[in-house]
A protein has these predicted regions:
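N-terminal [4Fe-4S]-dependent radical SAM core
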Residues: 2-24, 42-84, 102, 133-139
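Flexible mid-to-C-terminal extensions adjoining Fe-S/redox cofactors in radical SAM and related proteins
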Residues: 6-11, 352, 369, 375-475
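Short loop/turn microsegments at loop-to-beta-strand junctions
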Residues: 10, 357-360
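Short, acidic, Ser/Thr-enriched surface-loop or helix-capping motifs
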Residues: 17, 364-365
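Conserved alpha-helical substructure of the radical SAM core
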Residues: 69-192, 197
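Hydrophobic faces of well-ordered beta-strands that scaffold small-molecule active sites
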Residues: 83, 143-145, 178-180, 201-203, ...
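Conserved radical SAM core fold
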Residues: 104-105, 152-154, 184-188, 200-218, ...
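Radical SAM enzyme [4Fe-4S]-AdoMet core and its adjacent flexible, acidic
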Residues: 215-353, 357
Length: 475
């Protein structure tokens, strides 16, 4: 029998994994109560019969695949959304928490290297051949070209060459948009070019001077604030439309402080991310744990303290989580048109929340490695650009993912979160014996705790249900 879920309000629900729906019930099997009204008894008896007839109480084991079709991988490349280029691994800051710094052990050594235009051109030309092929079925596709580092502006010459090269490429139905992540130290030197070429900026800053204590400048005084203000004053329209902020949460700031600082000084709502928990060096775990602060806890703290800034962002964060929950468990969400024509039992899933290779982006490192994204450790290359040629074999990509999925797939089938997983297979740690483990696994004993939290939020704020169903669109 399925374990009932009792919300904090005292209502009882039953979740059916078989048809992926949640049913409100006064109490599981309550119709057998001898003191129940006869009409109520008949109602629940018929309802129970109907549910059993439709396998509501059957436990569903998801149909999971662990092998990608090679044609699927090639199709994703032909319909690519983002090409991310590490233009240099050199940086004019030395941030304590940097994913390429001393806290981590899953990245290549940083040698102040610069990306070569020829390598980028080889990859672009390879992709162009796919974008022009029959595999490209996108309609009016916008491809984001991202410049990553290090500090990308250190190698501005390369950025200009890439933009000039792509601007000369004419492919029907494809438009290029340029994005750059920067610490803003070199911003005044290149701001006119960035404005003229409509480059979108993501500026990294953690708040006030005290909040930025981990963002160590190697030489000279802190000029970031002045540079950002200069951009805002000289190009206000560009600043409004093309500039956003990213802040890293740690033990020297808080969500409240970050939001307050950036909203007050630049009238922007920042993206706030936690410290990267993937690939921490064994001898740095204690230091990492001291620096790490949970975004969820920081938001709760701000709300509890009555922050005037945080109510909106806390609500939005809550809505995002509720939307993901509803998409996963309410049984009425269809992510693609073909999903409308298949029963859930016919849909094949893959373990974890790992993206299909190249479905989101492709990342080229200074070392010539091709990765599925910048967050994946560089011990997992999917291909290379070296010696004047590209080596990207869809069969080898398929085998790598198969190797990663195999040890975890049986665990995923039994996990409560199999439809709502948030971890990438590349992030899964190994135990002392080298076996892959998942720290987020939830078994049947956790069903009440997990479901009741979200259900209670919807009980308490029924308006959110309507807002999420009719107003919120999260991709």
């Amino acid at each position: 029998m399925i374990q009932p879920v009792i919300s904090k309000s005292g209502y009882t629900y039953i979740y059916s994994s078989y048809i992926n729906s949640i049913l409100l019930s006064p109490s599981e099997n309550e119709y057998v109560d001898i003191d129940m009204d006869k009409n109520a008894y008949e109602y629940y008896k018929q309802k129970d019969f109907f549910l059993r007839e439709n396998n509501f109480f059957e436990k569903k084991i998801p149909n999971m695949e662990i092998e990608y079709d090679t044609s699927c991988i090639e199709s994703e490349l032909a319909n690519l959304n983002q090409l991310l280029i590490e233009v240099t691994d050199e940086c004019n800051l030395s941030c304590k928490y940097c994913s390429y710094g001393d806290l981590y052990s899953n990245q290549d050594e940083r040698n102040r290297g610069k990306q070569e235009f020829n390598n980028v051109k080889i990859l672009i030309d390879y992709l162009i051949s796919l974008w022009k092929s029959y595999r490209n079925i996108s309609f009016n596709n916008t491809i984001n070209i991202g410049f990553f580092g290090g500090e990308p502006l250190v190698n501005m010459i390369l950025i200009e060459k890439i933009i000039n090269y792509l601007n000369a490429v004419k492919i029907k139905g494809i438009t290029f948009v340029y994005n750059l992540t920067t610490n803003a130290i070199l911003l005044p030197k290149y701001m006119n070019y960035l404005v003229e070429n409509d480059v979108h900026l993501l500026i990294s800053i953690d708040g006030s001077k005290q909040n930025n204590i981990y963002r160590v400048k190697k030489e000279g005084k802190d000029i970031v604030f002045a540079n950002i203000k200069k951009l805002k004053d000289n190009h206000p329209n560009y600043f409004d439309s093309n500039v956003n902020f990213n802040s890293v949460l740690h033990d020297k700031n808080s969500v409240d402080q970050i939001y307050s600082y950036i909203k007050t000084n630049f009238d922007k709502t920042p993206y706030i991310s936690e410290l990267n928990r993937n690939g921490i060096a064994e001898d740095k775990k204690e230091e990492f744990n001291r620096m790490f602060h949970s975004k969820e806890d920081s938001i709760k703290q701000a709300v509890n303290c009555g922050s005037s800034y945080l109510k909106e962002i806390a609500d939005d964060s809550h809505i995002v989580q509720l939307d993901i929950f509803m998409q996963s468990y309410f049984g009425n969400t269809y992510k693609t048109i073909p999903d409308l024509f298949f029963q859930d039992k016919d849909i094949k899933y893959f373990p974890t929340s790992t993206c299909v290779p190249f479905s989101k982006k492709i990342f080229l490192t200074v070392q010539g490695k091709i990765l599925p994204c910048e967050k994946v450790g560089q011990q997992y290359p999917l291909g290379y650009v070296r010696d004047g040629k590209i080596n990207l074999d869809s069969k080898e990509v398929k085998q790598l993912y198969l190797k990663l999925y195999t040890p975890i797939v049986d665990k995923c089938k039994k996990c409560l979160l199999w439809k709502n997983c948030e971890i990438c297979v590349f992030y899964l740690p190994k135990d002392e014996e080298g076996q892959t483990v998942c720290p987020y696994y939830l078994g049947n004993e956790d069903v009440n705790r997990y479901f009741s939290t979200y259900i209670y939020a919807l009980e308490k704020h029924p308006d959110l249900l309507d807002r999420i169903e009719n107003e919120i669109l999260i991709d």
